[in-house]
Amino acid sequence: DSMLAQGGVCVLKDVNDFKCYFEDTMKAGHWENDPDSVRVMIESSQEVIGTLIDLGVDFDTDKDGKYDYTREGAHRRNRILHHKDETGKEITDTLLDIAKKKENITIVPKTTMIDFIEKDNVCQGIVCEDEYGEMGSILARDIILATGGLGGLFLNSTNYPHITGDSFALAIKHGVELKDINYIQIHPTTLYSKKKGRRFLISESVRGEGAILLNENGERFTDELQ
């Protein structure tokens, strides 16, 4: 679902903005965020963005050639670098193209993880199934689970239906400790449709630029940050 991200990526433009950036982030998380994690995210943002730019990610610039910063949701200042309205696709495509060229990376497409291969309480690989229903295995010394969230389990979601939290289920099955799985990010604004399936995402940038949520009577019905 990284491909679907529209708005952009936050970055600390200036050290003088740290306090405001930190407060905006904590407020948006109802002050339940891990403060240390928020600090690391903000402090490392310039380095991360710099790396993405060096790798070829094309963030939008203004007529003077300077980066064009926009604003999202709870941010009081413009801190968002973006690529048109498809920032996630730009970043994902760029990184994927690089990964495909790496000799030490093997990409196995259209393959689903079915289970862990466990021996003596150590994960040694995974059982997988390809698009033709053929079962196989992939062995590895270390396993990193990066299968995304579980938004596809919900009736109304901007996630694709196959985003079902498979890694969480397998982790629980094999006794792997999980943390904070009660925090599920649901994108709050989508284009209304009577059709079943994934909803079209309306970016937080819309609210960042001043849009508000109204009911059918044209009345505000919520504080977007509550």
Which stretches of residues belong to each language-model region?
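Gly-rich Lys/Arg/Thr-decorated short loops/hinges at beta-loop-alpha junctions or inter-strand turns
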Residues: 6, 32, 70-79, 147-149
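A conserved beta-strand/loop capping segment in the N-terminal third of enzymes
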Residues: 39-77, 212
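Redox-cofactor-proximal catalytic regions of oxidoreductases
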Residues: 1-57
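Residues forming the flavin
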Residues: 1-23, 61-63, 84-226
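Short amphipathic alpha-helical patches
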Residues: 32-33, 48-49, 75-76, 167, ...
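Short coil/turn segments at secondary-structure junctions
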Residues: 29-36, 78-82, 151, 155, ...
